Amino acid sequence: MIEVFDKIRDLDEFIQISLLSEFYYCKRRCSLILLEGNNSDNVYTMEGTIQHSKVHSSQTEKRLDSAKIFNLELFSNNYSLIGKADCIECVKDKRGAYIDILDGYYNLYPVEYKHGKLRDEEEYKIQLCAQAICLEEMYNITIEKGYLYFINDNKRLEVRLSDELRQKVLFGIVEILKIISESKMYPPKYKKSCPKCSLYEKCAPKNENINGYIKNMWEEIL
């Protein structure tokens, strides 16, 4: 972990937290977004964007012993991360972090909103963990858990922010920075979810796989 941390500190680039989710979902998609500026919308991404926008209807909601902060800017100088949190749930605790906009001490729990129904996706957990890492640096605290909230069925999943998950965040950061610094384009790898991707036509995973197969055949013949 220390070796990975040192690699990150030696680099000047900052990356968006959401790119970690892209990277672990599909490395090809992540490299297309970074290197060719491709980030098109389709019916699936547009629906998710509309639902996401409803999350940010207000900046704060404060109750007696708890509060919610929406659309909070996040950063980590140590890990070269920037981004926004959909929602931070704040629970009053004298041992927690002082939050100036709430004028009190709170424990913080990041909540990432996702389109669709409840499902256990690793890339979502990694994105959530990266948000927690930023909050820990910003407020000098330790966060042990966060939540994934699924909009369509109004359910949420508790995520324990384990050492294993944190290691995956660090590995993802280093690999994304390599894509940027080395112009590293990942090859396509077709899977069932590919046709729903907004970059499906640009990526052309089936065509690339066929071309690669033909090339290998010719190399064997020659």
Explain the meaning of each model-derived region.
Residues Y25, D86, A130, S193-K196, ...:
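Generic detector of isolated residues embedded in canonical secondary-structure elements
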Residues M1-P110, I210, E219-L222:
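Metal-dependent nuclease catalytic cores that hydrolyze phosphodiester bonds in DNA/RNA
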Residues C26-R28, I33, E47, V55, ...:
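Generic signature of intrinsically disordered, low-complexity segments enriched in small/polar residues
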Residues D10-L20, E123, M185-K192:
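Structural motif
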Residues D65-E175:
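Mg2+/Mn2+-dependent nuclease catalytic core
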Residues E136-L222:
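Metal-dependent nuclease catalytic regions and adjoining charged, substrate-binding loops involved
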